[in-house]
């Protein structure tokens, strides 16, 4: 019996010692690789199409230096850390296709981002950016750019050169107007400018002939511009929570809007929480077909 208790006691102590050791030896994956003499490249994940490396939610305040030697990396995820600076050495990662910097504390991006000539997707949302370097416009392959939840009020005019950009998120910033360079992005299919300080939508919006999703909710927009009705490719138009009082008779031209939408994810026209007087809110609630009919009749009377 005593021997059993002794063995049981020994078993109880074993895991506790292991747990204690685990806490003391809790190395990050890259530290573990370096301490064991392994090549950091062994941490790379090789998928069918991309070589990726992830350091998500590590509590990092600095990026480990060895990373800049991993020239093979094509997808790099550094999101949800506490990074305050992206060093210029990022320019060494010339094969990067996807770079995720979401959820850090970055106040700026280095000019060396211009060296990332393969970059197609860049997430810098949920940071502290007050400006974006003009050099980013040299990343001519860029297709997706998220700058939401920052402190931006303008974009460099040369962003008009991002001719392949298809999705742009500028929501939750301090824009008083949509930057003019945006209206030169002919391939844009998604534009989110919600929760800014917009009071109007420029007539130039009509130049975005490929736009399918336009979100401008949560601003202080006073009028629904007729030029927006010329963007006939729109499938989702969200103008919720603004100061719009009337709808243009040309609204029926947006024939790809299939319904009055209430769920934020649904395609259609989102126009709730506006002080509509003409047409009456009750008419809007009757559905898009009734609304279009009313606006057409109004136009011919």
UniProtKB/Swiss-Prot annotation:
Family annotation (Pfam families): LRR_1 (PF00560), LRR_8 (PF13855)
Biological process terms in GO annotation: intracellular signal transduction
InterPro entries for this protein: Leu-rich_rpt, Leu-rich_rpt_typical-subtyp, LRR_dom_sf, LRR_domain-containing
Cleavable signal peptide: none
Record keyword Iron-sulfur present: no
Positions of transmembrane segments: none
Domain of life of the source: Eukaryota
LRR repeats: 72-93, 95-116, 118-139, 141-163, 164-185, 187-208, 210-231, 233-254, 265-287
Keywords: Leucine-rich repeat, Repeat
UniProt name for this protein: Leucine-rich repeat-containing protein 30
Organism in which the protein naturally occurs: Homo sapiens (Human)
Lineage, highest ranks first: Eukaryota, Metazoa, Chordata, Craniata, Vertebrata
Encoding gene (name): LRRC30
């Amino acid at each position: 019996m005593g021997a059993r208790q002794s063995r049981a006691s020994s078993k109880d102590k074993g895991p506790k010692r292991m747990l204690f050791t685990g806490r003391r030896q809790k190395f990050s994956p890259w530290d573990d690789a370096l301490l064991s003499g392994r090549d950091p490249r062994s941490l790379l994940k090789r998928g069918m199409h991309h070589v990726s490396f992830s350091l998500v939610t590590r509590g990092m305040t600095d990026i480990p230096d060895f990373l800049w030697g991993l020239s093979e990396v094509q997808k790099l995820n550094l999101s949800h850390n506490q990074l305050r600076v992206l060093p210029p050495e990022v320019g060494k990662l010339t094969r990067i296709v996807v770079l995720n910097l979401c959820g850090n504390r970055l106040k700026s991006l280095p000019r060396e981002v211009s060296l990332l000539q393969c970059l197609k997707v860049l997430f810098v949302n949920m940071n502290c950016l007050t400006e974006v370097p003009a050099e980013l416009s040299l990343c001519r392959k860029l297709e997706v750019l998220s700058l939401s939840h920052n402190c931006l009020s303008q974009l460099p005019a040369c962003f008009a050169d991002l001719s392949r950009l298809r999705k742009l998120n500028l929501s939750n910033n301090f824009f008083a107007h949509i930057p003019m360079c945006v209206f030169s992005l002919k391939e844009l299919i998604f534009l989110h400018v919600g929760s800014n300080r917009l009071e109007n939508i420029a007539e130039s919006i009509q130049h975005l002939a490929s736009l399918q999703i336009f979100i401008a909710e949560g601003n202080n927009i006073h009028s629904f511009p007729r030029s927006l009705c010329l963007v006939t490719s729109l499938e989702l138009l969200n103008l919720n929570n603004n100061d719009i009082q009337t709808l243009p008779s040309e609204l029926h031209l947006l024939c790809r809007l299939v319904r009055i939408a209430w769920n934020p994810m649904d395609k259609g026209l989102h126009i709730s929480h506006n002080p509509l007087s003409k047409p009456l809110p009750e008419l809007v609630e009757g559905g898009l077909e009734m609304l279009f009919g009313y606006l057409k009749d109004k136009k011919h009377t």
